[in-house]
Regions:
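Active-site loop architecture of trypsin-fold serine endopeptidases
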Residues: 23, 99-103, 127-130, 163, ...
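A conserved glycine-rich beta-strand in the N-terminal activation segment of trypsin-fold
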Residues: 75-83, 96-116, 131, 138-141, ...
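Conserved positions in beta-strands of structured domains
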Residues: 96, 109-111, 124, 143-146, ...
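N-terminal activation segment of mature serine protease catalytic domains
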Residues: 24-107, 121, 129, 175
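Catalytic-histidine neighborhood of serine endopeptidases
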Residues: 24-37, 112-152, 158-162
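Terminal peptide-recognition signature
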Residues: 90-95, 108, 115-119, 142, ...
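Gram-positive cell-envelope targeting signals
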Residues: 1-41
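Active-site substrate-binding loop(s) of clan PA
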Residues: 83-84, 143-145, 162-189, 261
Length: 262
C-alpha cells in the first residue's frame, strides 16, 4: 500500500541530435521523478508543476472545422485482430511537433477524407509547428483547428484529400470485458503502426490530472510513450477512444493500467 504511482502522458520526446523518449509525469500521490531507465539514452521528463505551455502552431482559418460522425454498431460478429488492423492502419498517422530544441512525437487518427486529424492536446502543447506523417510516409504541415487541455484533445488540418478516415463508434455501448485493440507509435516512428490488444477493464474511471478530473476508459491493452493520440478500437473495428495515459508505480511493477478518452 505504500507504493507511489504516477500517471504518464504517452508522449515521446526526441531531442535534436539524438533520440530520447520521455513522458510528462503527473503524480497520483506525491510529486517525484521516476528513476532513469537502464539504457542511458532514455530518460524521463521532470514532474509537471506549471501551467500548460502555449501552443503557437499556425491556426486554420476561422470557420474551418468538421463533424465527427459516430456510426452505429455494425451487424455481424466480432472482427479478427488481423481484420481490425487492416481496416484501421491507413487511418493512423504520426505527429511531429517542433518544440524548442527538440520534437514531441505522438500519434493521430484521421477523422475525415479531407485532412482532419484528432490527437491529444499534450502532444502539441508548447509546439511552434506540427507535421503529420501518413502511412505512405508523405509529410504535411498541419494547422491547428482547435485544442482543449482539460479534455486533452486537439484537432489538426492538413492540405490533403483522399485520406482514409477511421470509423468512430459509440463508446457508451462498451462493457467491462469487451475486447479492444490499440494502434499507435510506441517510442516514436521506428515502431509506428504497432497494435496491442486487451479488454476494457473499467468504464467511467475518474482520473485526477493536474487538479481536474478526466473520465476515462481503462484498458489492459499495452500502451507506451508515443501512443498518445492513438486509437482504441472495439471488436467491430470502430475507434471508441483516444489513448492518452498509463499508470506506473515507483517501487513495484504495474502492468495493464492504460487509459483512453471515450
Amino acid at each position: 500500500s505504500g507504493a507511489a504511482a504516477v500517471l504518464l502522458f504517452l508522449l515521446t520526446m526526441a531531442l535534436l541530435g539524438g533520440l530520447t523518449a520521455a513522458a510528462g509525469l503527473w503524480s497520483h500521490s506525491r510529486l517525484e521523478e521516476l528513476p532513469a531507465l537502464a539504457d542511458s539514452t532514455w530518460q524521463p521528463l521532470p514532474v509537471r508543476e506549471e501551467l500548460p505551455e502555449e501552443t503557437t502552431v499556425e491556426r486554420a482559418p476561422t470557420g474551418d472545422g468538421t463533424t465527427l460522425t459516430i456510426s452505429p454498431l455494425p451487424s455481424g460478429g466480432a472482427h479478427s485482430l488481423q481484420e481490425i488492423y487492416r481496416e484501421n492502419i491507413a487511418s493512423i498517422v504520426s505527429i511531429r511537433g517542433s518544440k524548442g530544441d527538440g520534437m514531441s512525437l505522438g500519434t493521430g487518427v484521421v477523422m475525415s477524407e479531407d485532412g482532419y486529424i484528432i490527437t491529444n492536446s499534450h502532444v502539441i502543447e508548447g509546439c511552434g509547428a506540427v507535421d503529420v506523417v501518413l502511412q505512405d510516409e508523405r509529410v504535411f504541415q498541419a494547422l491547428l483547428v482547435g485544442q482543449d487541455a482539460q479534455s486533452d484533445l486537439a484537432v489538426l488540418k492538413i492540405d490533403c484529400a483522399g485520406l482514409t478516415p477511421a470509423q468512430f463508434g459509440d463508446s457508451t455501448l462498451l462493457e467491462v470485458g469487451d475486447a479492444v485493440a490499440a494502434i499507435g507509435n510506441p517510442l516514436g516512428e521506428e515502431l509506428r503502426g504497432t497494435m496491442t490488444d486487451g479488454i476494457i477493464s473499467a468504464i467511467n474511471r475518474d482520473v485526477n490530472v493536474d487538479g481536474y478530473t478526466m473520465v476515462l476508459l481503462q484498458t489492459t491493452a499495452a500502451l507506451n510513450s508515443g501512443n498518445s493520440g492513438g486509437a482504441l478500437i472495439n471488436d467491430r473495428g470502430q475507434v471508441v477512444g483516444i489513448t492518452n495515459l498509463k499508470m506506473r508505480a515507483y517501487d513495484n511493477t504495474v502492468e495493464g493500467l492504460g487509459f483512453a478518452i471515450p
